[in-house]
Structures are given as structure tokens and as C-alpha cells.
Amino acid sequence: MAKEQKAFECIRMVERQDKPRTSGLTYARDLGMGLRSLEAELESSAEFIDILKLTSFVPRIQSKKLISDKIKLCRKYDVEVGLGGALLEIALLQGPQTVKAFLGEVRDFGITHLEVCRQAVIMPLPHLLELIALVKDMGILPLAEVGVAYGITADEEIYVDDAKLVGTMKKCMEAGAWKVLLESEGLTESRHKKDYRCDVVSKVANAFNLDDVMFEADDRDVYTRYITQYGPEVNLFVDYTRITHLECTRRGGWGKHPVINRVATFYGFGKGKKR
């Protein structure tokens, strides 16, 4: 879609890459919105959303027409569509033929990105890697979701093997993952703030080109921290209700005090905003 002139252009703000972006991606969770709600969200925020995620079990209880219409609407606003890993995990438990039928329907819908994970299922790593390669071969971009915990409470203690975590993420990339998504549960989600495992996030960030990693960061203090530590072009996965605040934080115009008037980007001399 053609870009419209912004209001108050006399006020400078941090530049961001134009779509299609190679970094600073925003992956937004859709919680089952209808068409009118989705269009209202896209009308105000589509420029800041790179991929809309159809999440959890929700697409299974919605009509095929609604899902198809939502995908068409996203395309109209230059937003790609991804699908969370829950349905794929259920398909895995129901056998190879269900997996085959499910992946075929994902492709037929025109869904471009699919989370591949083993959050709920117990599956050997080589099988996960084979699944990533299969999804890629079907022309779907596999987003390998990797985490340290699933279904915990804030008061539960967990053991984090960060070397194993980083190793798994690297193997997922080698198998053909488009990017790896670091699940927040056990790191910042379901943790008291004093127990955040930002040390683990830091080890992941240091082990990868940041363009290859997506960080789940639903809470404002978490994504503000990531922007402060890794810059405004870090890839982030948030709820769609966070989009406007997140984009303002990326541009240094909103957010907690560490970000205000401190955020900057640099794309070289006279090269524009694409790279």
C-alpha cells in the first residue's frame, strides 16, 4: 500500500526499514479477531506489523471462509500471515497422514510462516529437524520455536541448560528454519521480575546474528529492555494490542525512561532505509 504522509512531520523520529524488512520485524499474535476488528487494527497499525500470527487452537474453531478472508485482508495491507505451532503438534499426535493433510491445508490457505516446535509433544530432536526441512520443502517458512519451559507457574523452579538451548537453536537453523523464536516462558513469562533470566537471553543473542532470532516479549518492560540492550531493529513477537506502543518505543518516542530520546539507527550515507 502507498505510504501516507505522517502527522507532525516537524518532529523528527528514528528511521526504520521499509517493508519488506530484514530486521526489526514485528510478529503479532491475533487472538481470533473477526474481520471488522482486524481491519480496524490493520488500518492503524499495518505498517508496523510484518507477520500476523493465527494463534493456538483458535483457527480450528473458526470457519474456513473467515480464515481465508483474514488472510486476504492481511495481504491487502501488506502483512504476511503465520500460524502457531499448536495445531501442528496436535497433528503430530494424530499421525503422519494428519500431518500431511494439515500441511497441505496450510499451503493451500497461502499461510507463509509456520511455527514448528515441540512445546507440548515429546519428540526427538532429529525428528523436529526433519519436520523443519519438510515444511521448508513445501514452500512454507518454518519458524522454529524453542524454549526452556512449558505450562509452569511463577513460583516453580526450572533448570535451564543454556548450552543445550543454543545448540538446539543452531541445529534448527541448519535444518532450514527461517528464524528461531525464543519462547519467553520460564525466562520472563511466568517469572517474577526479580527472577527474569535475561542472562539466558543474552547468551542466545551473543550466539546468533540477531536477524535470525525472534524474541517473544509480551510485557512492556521486557520488550523495552530488549530494545535498550539490542537496539530498535531487534525482532520481537508480541500481542497485537502492544503494536502501537512497541513501534513508538522502537522509534524512541515512548516507553520507559531508558528509551526516551536514546534510540538511534544508521543505514549509511545516502543509502535510504533499506538494506
Task: Identify the residue ranges that each predicted region occupies.
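Conserved N-terminal beta1-alpha1 strand-loop-helix module at the mouth
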Residues: 1-69
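C-terminal alpha-helical cap/extension of soluble enzyme domains
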Residues: 4-15, 203-275
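Active-site-adjacent beta->alpha loops and helix N-cap segments on the catalytic face
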Residues: 12-15, 36, 60-73, 91-100, ...
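Active-site mouth loops of central-metabolism enzymes
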Residues: 21-37, 55-60, 82-98, 121, ...
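Hydrophobic faces of well-ordered beta-strands that scaffold small-molecule active sites
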Residues: 23-29, 49-54, 79-85, 114-116, ...
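Generic structural signal for hydrophobic
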Residues: 41-45, 74, 105-106, 135, ...
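Catalytic cores of alpha/beta
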Residues: 97-102, 163-173, 219-232
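Conserved anion-binding
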Residues: 113-189
